[in-house]
A protein has these predicted regions:
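N-terminal secretory signal peptides
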Residues: 1-36
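A short, N-terminal "cap"/entry segment at the start of jelly-roll beta-barrel domains
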Residues: 37, 43, 48-120, 220-300, ...
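Histidine-centered metal-chelating micro-motifs
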Residues: 128-130, 149, 168-170, 174-179, ...
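Short histidine-centered beta-strand/loop micro-motifs
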Residues: 130-134, 161-162, 181-182, 310-315, ...
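Glycine- and acidic-residue-biased ligand/ion/polar-headgroup-sensing regions
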Residues: 134-155, 314-335
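Short acidic-glycine-tyrosine-enriched beta hairpin
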Residues: 155-173, 335-353
Length: 424
């Protein structure tokens, strides 16, 4: 055999070896791709009877793994603690004058109360809260004691003069000038509510303050007063000033052609028929029945001893409470495991943020009366009893992990105010 033949045979043998090696590597690669994991089993095994059996085993393994694997909860967010929601309005210093007092609460004193400011004002007989207006806030008021006469002027020239007694309320839109006077015989106490927590009663636009800032010449030309009379006017804001008790029948306006408004600013809240519940009653007045009150809703709630105003929230507005008489505990819920409970007495204020869950528990032997306001045009509420009654029983059983018998004991309609120690 020649050297050439021997070389050809050697080359052929070498090629066969390379081919065999290539096939072996390819086979190994394929086998490597078919490792027996759950993913490769489900992805690579044909869905024959054997394949389905393997897939079933893989699914069972997944379920077992899920059962064995502990639940991973999301990391708890660090939320700030709930803000203080209690303020002693009548216990504050405020303004003390010869014929009246005024104590206010704004965000400066009560940071949580961003949307509402309030004033507790007392006028002695004849006392006048002078002519003034509010540039940034509307004024809503509720008379607790005494008798008050108001005058107000609208931008289209309509004027009103109204008398108010206990249980009456008024509303003056932002920028409408007005004045208040106690008709006697006793002190008049009323609560003023403003639809802006940054508003200060001590920063209103008062007529004496303005007159004192204008040159006598300009003021004389504009008011018709002599320079001698102007020299004797107050040198600054009078705010609350003494006055003579006016006649019981309102005196006519100086302008005989004045456009008289027909009590559009007045509403007799306590004459409204209340909603009655086992533990008390409530009167709510919003713009649907008091059309001028576009920015504040008012309510009076009376709770009998031991009553519970059920858990609820307001989806459209914050809530501002003033305690007129009696005591109560208020509990609020601010999500993320945050809650707070405070006890309230007469003269104190509570503020609950929009959407925060809360309840009111009456305490003590004396009934409790609360003035409640909301910076909104319409009253809205979601109560827990209504929420529970408008869901299927099976869902509630599974949500709470309780029995059908337990769910059957839950309220099936709105409860609002529970009676003493009642459980629904």
């Amino acid at each position: 055999m020649s050297d050439e033949s021997n070389g050809s045979e050697a080359m052929a043998a070498e090629n066969e070896a390379k081919l065999a090696g290539s096939e072996t590597n390819e086979t190994k690669s394929r086998l490597g791709d078919l490792k027996l994991t759950r993913r490769s089993l489900l992805g690579a095994v044909p869905l024959t009877t054997a394949g389905l059996s393997l897939a079933s085993l893989a699914g069972a393994g997944r379920a077992d793994a899920q059962q064995m694997k502990p639940q991973i909860r999301r990391e708890k967010r660090k939320e700030p603690p709930l803000e203080n929601f209690k303020y002693d309005l009548d216990g504050s210093t405020g303004f003390v004058g010869e014929v009246g007092t005024a104590k206010e609460v704004t965000v400066a004193e009560f940071p949580v109360s961003e949307s509402i400011a309030g004033v507790s004002m007392v006028l002695k007989p004849g006392g006048i809260r002078e002519l003034h207006w509010h540039a940034i806030a509307a004024e809503w008021a509720y008379v607790i004691d005494g008798n008050v006469r108001t005058t107000v002027l609208g931008p289209t020239g309509e004027a009103a003069q109204d008398d108010f007694g206990p249980g009456d309320l008024w509303y003056f839109p932002k920028g409408h000038p007005h004045a208040l006077q106690n008709l006697g015989p006793g002190d008049a106490h009323f609560i003023l509510v403003f639809d802006d927590g940054h508003f200060s009663e001590f920063g209103t636009f008062s007529i004496t303050d303005w007159f004192s800032q204008v040159s006598p010449d300009i003021l004389s030309r504009d008011s018709g007063l002599s320079l001698q009379t102007i020299a004797g006017l107050p040198k600054g804001e009078a705010y609350i000033t003494p006055g003579r008790i006016p006649p019981r029948s309102p005196a006519p306006f100086r302008d005989g052609d004045a456009i008289i408004s027909q009590s559009a600013h007045k509403f007799r809240m306590l004459e409204r028929e209340p909603q009655k519940w086992p533990g008390g009653e409530e009167r709510v007045v919003d713009s649907h029945i008091f059309p001028i009150s576009k920015t504040i809703v008012g309510a009076i709630m009376d709770l009998q001893p031991g009553a519970l105003r059920e858990m609820h929230w307001h989806p459209n507005a914050d809530e501002w409470q003033y305690y007129i008489k009696g005591r109560a505990r208020v509990g609020i819920f601010g999500a993320h495991g945050r809650s707070k409970v405070e006890e309230f007495a007469p003269g104190q204020v509570a503020f609950i943020k929009q959407g925060f869950g809360h309840y009111i528990e009456q305490v003590g032997d004396e009934p409790t009366r609360i003035l409640i306001t909301f910076p909104a045009a319409e009253y809205q509420e979601i109560s827990v009893s209504t929420w529970l009654s408008n869901n299927p029983s099976l869902l509630l059983e599974d949500n709470f992990g309780i029995s059908a018998a337990d769910v059957a004991r839950m309220p099936k309609s709105k409860m609002a105010i529970y009676g003493p120690h009642s459980k629904g």
